[in-house]
Amino acid sequence: MIIRWNRIEAMNQKMITQTKMTRRILLRVAYDGMNYHGWQLQPNAATIEGELNRALCALTGEEIVVTGASRTDAGVHALGNVAVFDTTSRIPAEKFSYALNQRLPEDIVIQSSKQVADDFHPRHCDCRKTYEYDILNRTFPLPAYRNTAYFLYGTLNIEAMRRACQAFLGEHDFASFCAAGAQVQTTVRKIYSLEVECRPLTEAGTPVPPASGEAVNAADGK
């Protein structure tokens, strides 16, 4: 009787340990930053990090704080920022994206979620970031682009812009570009590529489509 009781107690203890095992989950996040004061958590201000923390706490019942790869500024958008968090929740890693999207505002969408190594850190990993800056170069601005592109009237010398971009390639100290009090370990960054691309708009101000509607329907099997 005593031996069996000890065995059951050990099995129960093992089950508790397995249940509370901590996992690190990676989120790929897209968002429209116009309604937020940047990524980083701030008191009495709406931020991307704050919304993610709130949704995760509501979902798991745990006090969770995410760690992001890029702490974007106010009004900055992202197509695939990366964040991680630790949890003891038993929700399958790939299901977090679906569950969180039910709890997040419509301008923040989790594109994917997966489990990563416990020591993975989005700001310390050997990875590259891609930034895109859009310039709306035409006679009049377009309201549809007011939050996603910088309006510039006048003719741009594209070839001169491309030549100037070459000066930024390689490793440089970007301390002069940082805001006062920026908390970073180093201001040295390496630029691997920098391209200027022209994308024409139609007279109506919409991008020239790469494929017609008929081609899209064909791809959908219609």
Residue ranges and their predicted role:
Residues 5-8, 12-222:
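Structured-RNA-binding interfaces characteristic of tRNA pseudouridine synthases
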